A protein has these predicted regions:
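N-terminal, post-signal peptide beta-strand-biased segments of exported outer-membrane/organellar beta-barrel
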Residues: 15-132, 136
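Outer-membrane beta-barrel porins/channels
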Residues: 18-23, 124-294
Length: 294
């Protein structure tokens, strides 16, 4: 019998996103809300654990996954804009996409499940992952100058964006199966490892051309953090299969926050955490404290 699965996906992402990708979810482009299995239900729809009580104990010994996404990287855009000529209509269409994100963006993530600390049993699951994220943005002004030149807009926004962070995510997932529906939640503790990035609220750079010449100015505020703590929450619901149809919905990181610099205080037991060459950040030979920025 041919089955039809209809999924409704509602996802709210914070700084950190879904984890535990496998080959199946990559092939399905993330449409996993009603068909994820076992440990891989975590991060997509925790309610699915409730309908898997008959399955045996599942234990993940090792694995990792990584990915790169952006607002230009796709087979469609590469095929559409590859060639020896880029017409004005093509430029306008492409530039609208860049404007929505404020530039050309690249987001990279790396997920490493902590060995032997990921398992499911019945309607419960415990997961632990080391997650490393980075986000880089080429300024919109640079793209505008490459596509159109600077004749029509003498002042260009050249603000660069960059952030990198690492954290450990520990999650406890449980689901309550009812007669025809299952609801589930994932409670997550987020252990911040490090953070460094350009503050987008106070940083800026521009390039100006006029009759007198070409000049520019800029100001960047770099923030850093080592050690932090926070919490996250995923919630989901899914129905049992009925005449080949399954419906599901989930909120991933419905609540999610990390407060940085929670483990940097100097006490009588010893010095604060240091990573040579990385943390604490130095500027013109001076070491910055955990609450300072440049």
């Amino acid at each position: 019998m041919k089955k039809i699965i209809l999924s409704f996906i509602l996802i709210v992402t914070c700084t950190f996103g879904q984890t535990k990708r496998d080959a199946r979810v990559v092939g399905l482009a993330g449409t996993y809300t009603t068909i994820a299995d076992g440990i891989f239900s975590v991060g997509y729809n925790p309610a699915l654990i409730g309908f898997q009580q008959h399955k045996p104990f599942q234990w993940q010994l090792f694995g990792f996954d990584t990915g790169v996404i952006g607002n230009f990287i796709s087979f469609e855009t590469i095929a559409e804009y590859s060639g020896d000529t880029l017409y004005t209509a093509d430029k306008d269409k492409l530039f609208e996409n860049f404007e929505d994100a404020g530039g050309l963006t690249f987001f990279q993530d790396f997920h490493l499940p902590i060995p032997a600390l990921n398992f499911t049993s019945g309607n419960l699951a415990f997961t632990s992952n080391a997650i490393f994220l980075s986000n880089f943005k080429l300024p919109i002004g640079l793209l505008e100058m490459m596509m159109y030149g600077n004749a029509n807009k003498p002042e260009l926004d050249m603000t660069l964006g960059y952030e990198i962070l690492g954290l450990n995510e520990y999650g406890l997932t449980f689901a309550i199966p009812l007669k025809n529906v299952s609801t589930g939640v994932t409670l997550k503790y987020l252990q911040g490892l490090f953070y460094m990035g350009i503050d987008p609220e106070t940083s800026y750079a521009n390039l100006i051309t006029d009759d007198k010449g070409l000049y520019g100015s800029g100001r960047y505020l770099l923030r850093q953090g080592m050690g932090g703590a926070g919490f996250g929450l995923d919630i989901g619901i899914v129905t049992k299969e009925f005449q080949g149809w399954t419906f599901g919905s989930s909120l991933i990181n419905a609540i999610g926050t990390i407060a940085w610099n929670k483990t940097n205080s100097v006490n009588d037991d010893g010095p604060s955490i240091t990573v040579p060459g990385i943390y604490p950040f130095t500027w013109e030979g001076e070491e910055l404290g955990p609450n300072e920025a440049v």
